[in-house]
């Protein structure tokens, strides 16, 4: 299979990044990619979707990862995964010898290791300039679920019509479920036995980078998790707070030492 053929399959089956901004997958398939990375850092608290999916479908995802590397001509295919995800690592090690091109890079348990710029530096030593794209450094990064969707499109000829979503926090039975695209957040939460608090707030995504949603909002191709929280939870209150309040607090506390900027992984 050549790059154009794989790109066509991705377009026809609606495969996009299953997290973040939902970047079209076919646009990452280029012969400029010297290294491809699988992002299984998953550093948002409470979220386990990627490691669960990779553990359950290790062979299928690794096979697809190797196929993508061969198609674009990448010399390395690196799985970036935190060293604490022991069960998932064990599942990968059962098949790693079948794919000589694929390597596992163990990551430290720090935040924000899942940020692709941080991941690229930790796994390859390459630095993406501020505002730049990974491909400028010869790297393409793929989400675990995205690669599983590539597998389903190539091997099973199935388009992306469903999404894996973790439902956690104030629910009866925290669970990861497979649901059709377009169903509401309330319908997904019902699969976890319903909420355990009155007037719940549906927080879409992880507690660090997520947003407040509405129960009638639809599941999209980038919906990874739903956190059900009480309305007075500190995370909810922080998201509802205006930025001007945070700026005033920062101005009253900051001594302009510049250390936070020096240490910021995005700087």
Language model features with spans:
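Hydrophobic alpha-helical positions that pack around
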Residues: 78, 83-183, 191-196, 206
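Iron-sulfur cluster-binding cysteine motifs and their immediate structural context
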Residues: 259-267
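Flexible, glycine/charged-enriched surface loops at secondary-structure junctions
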Residues: 72-79, 197-205, 264
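Short alpha-helical segments in extracytoplasmic peptidoglycan/chitin-binding modules
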Residues: 182, 187-189, 202, 264
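Extended, low-polarity segments enriched in aliphatic/aromatic residues
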Residues: 176-178, 210-225, 233
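Iron-sulfur-cluster electron-transfer modules
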Residues: 1-123, 251, 267
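Short acidic beta-strand-loop surface patches of small beta-rich interaction domains
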Residues: 82-86, 200-219
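Ferredoxin-like iron-sulfur electron-transfer modules
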Residues: 234-258
């Amino acid at each position: 299979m050549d790059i154009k053929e794989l790109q066509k399959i991705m377009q026809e089956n609606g495969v996009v990044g299953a997290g973040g901004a939902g970047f079209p997958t076919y646009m990452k398939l280029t012969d400029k990619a010297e290294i491809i990375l699988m992002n299984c850092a998953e550093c948002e608290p409470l979220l386990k979707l990627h490691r669960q999916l990779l553990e359950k479908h290790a062979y299928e995802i690794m096979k697809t990862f190797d196929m993508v590397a061969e198609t674009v001509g990448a010399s390395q295919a690196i799985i970036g995964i935190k060293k604490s995800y022991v069960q998932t690592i064990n599942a990968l090690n059962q098949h790693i010898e079948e794919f000589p091109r694929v390597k596992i890079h163990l990551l430290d348990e720090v935040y924000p290791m899942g940020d692709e710029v941080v991941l690229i530096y930790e796994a390859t030593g390459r630095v993406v300039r501020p505002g730049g794209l990974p491909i400028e450094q010869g790297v393409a990064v793929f989400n675990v679920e995205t690669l599983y969707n590539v597998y389903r499109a190539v091997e099973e000829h199935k388009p992306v019509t469903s999404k894996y979503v973790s439902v956690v926090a104030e629910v009866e039975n925290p669970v990861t479920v497979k649901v059709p695209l377009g169903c509401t957040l309330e319908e997904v939460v019902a699969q976890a036995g319903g909420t355990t608090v009155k007037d719940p707030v549906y927080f879409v995504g992880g507690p660090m980078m997520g947003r407040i949603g509405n129960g009638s909002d639809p599941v999209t191709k980038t919906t990874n998790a739903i956190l059900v929280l009480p309305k007075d939870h500190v995370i909810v209150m922080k998201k509802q707070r205006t930025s001007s309040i945070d700026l005033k607090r920062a101005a009253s506390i900051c001594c302009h030492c510049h250390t936070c900027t020096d240490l910021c992984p995005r700087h």
